[in-house]
Amino acid sequence: MKVLIGVDESRESRDAVKTSFELFGPNAEYTIANIAGRFGTGVLFNVGYAPTGQLSAKYLTEQFAAAEETARGAAELVPGGDVEIDAELGDAGVELCRLAEEQTSDVVVIGSQDKSVWQRLLDPSVGRYLIDHAPCPVLVVR
């Protein structure tokens, strides 16, 4: 069984990793992925900076390194540590769906963060996107 686990720095993500191992056991193939969001040019303009290729490249490199570190940290929660890690830049829901399809994952697992209605309006739910678009079943761990 191929299990794709989407993580961030939250406690809920750590719970999703642990629950995945409890449910699917040591024989499953695990991939732990963290997706770092990309910024648009408006973000830099809003804080008074004009984007340059050099600034953009540095920012993206830092974002990618942080995403890799988050995925590696979550991978340490899997007993035995036999886990693939993946770090991507982009929209979390879209990228997790793409990874699930590329890897022919049997299930995508994520942790659920309780958000208020206002928080969901400002930051749409990755879980909702996955449930609607993933090419395989989605397990949302609470």
Regions found by a protein language model. Give the residues of each.
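Structural beta-alpha unit
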Residues: 75-108
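Small/aliphatic-rich secondary-structure junction motif
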Residues: 1-54
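General small-molecule cofactor/ligand-binding pocket signal
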Residues: 31-33, 84-88, 139
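A short acidic, glycine-rich active-site loop
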Residues: 52-69
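Short secondary-structure boundary segments
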Residues: 34, 111-113, 142
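Glycine-rich, Arg-bearing micro-motifs that act as flexible, cationic patches
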Residues: 107-132
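Short conserved AdoMet
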Residues: 25, 79, 135
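Short, flexible loop segments at boundaries between secondary-structure elements
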Residues: 132-142
